[in-house]
Amino acid sequence: MEQIKRKYDKILVVNLEVNMKKKIIGVTPRINKTDSATFVRVHRNYIDKLTKLDLVPIIITPGSDLNTVLPLCDGFLIIGGDDYDPVMYNENNDQNESKEINPDMDKLDTDILNYATKNKIPVMGICRGHQAMSACFGKALYQDIESNHLEHPHDGIYHEVTKVNNFGLGKELPDKFITNTYHHQATKDLPDGFVVLYKNHDVIEAIEHETLPIIATQWHPERMDTKESDIIFNYFEKLIMNNSK
């Protein structure tokens, strides 16, 4: 029995050593509350895209010991989810345009971005994660695309995006291509240092930082099995692999 235990311990240590050689990606979740329970979830599409690249995702939840967890991560993925509290960018929600606000998630995203920018850790933002690049730094969002009369034509859940800057990720993607549409809010103002890569008429659809390893898309590339989606996630992996943490 003791021999079996020693063998098991050895296997466990070897597995841990192998896994620690892989790059770890901290992933934010969605929080869903019912009358009887709170659910923390991440859609499998996000996980599948990361593991396909041999990256190791770990879910970071509100209340986590960030001083312990964040230094473990070689990159961060801020996923889609609820709307940010407009108080973050000095606006109110009198018209109830921002929905299902979760202050705990707002704080978590802000803490992660502050850590990542300070330590130059790669970040990819998707949908809400794209809007995080503004809201978490006090820059405004359009709380509702329709009520702000933004031109944002789409056919069902799909629309076309057009390149406006041939920078970074933009150099690897075509001038125009079709993406999905699952959002009712959009970026209004960006912090200094961000370059707009793609737009759909009035709506900013993809951005990248000039000097920090940060990219973000308003659409959901993890939900699309296209060459463009593969390029985006491969580019994120390249940012991670090239980063000297």
Please name every model-derived segment.
Residues 1-126, 139-142, 146-173, 188-195, ...:
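N-terminal beta1-alpha1 cap of cysteine-dependent amidohydrolase-like domains
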Residues 129, 183, 203:
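A generic "binding-loop/recognition-motif" signal
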Residues 125, 129, 134:
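Gly/Ala-rich beta-loop-alpha elbow adjacent to hydrolase catalytic centers
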Residues 215-219:
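Active-site-proximal beta-strand elements of phosphoester/diester hydrolases
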Residues 180-184, 190:
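Internal anion-binding site segments
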Residues 111, 131, 185:
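Active-site phosphate/pyrophosphate-handling residues
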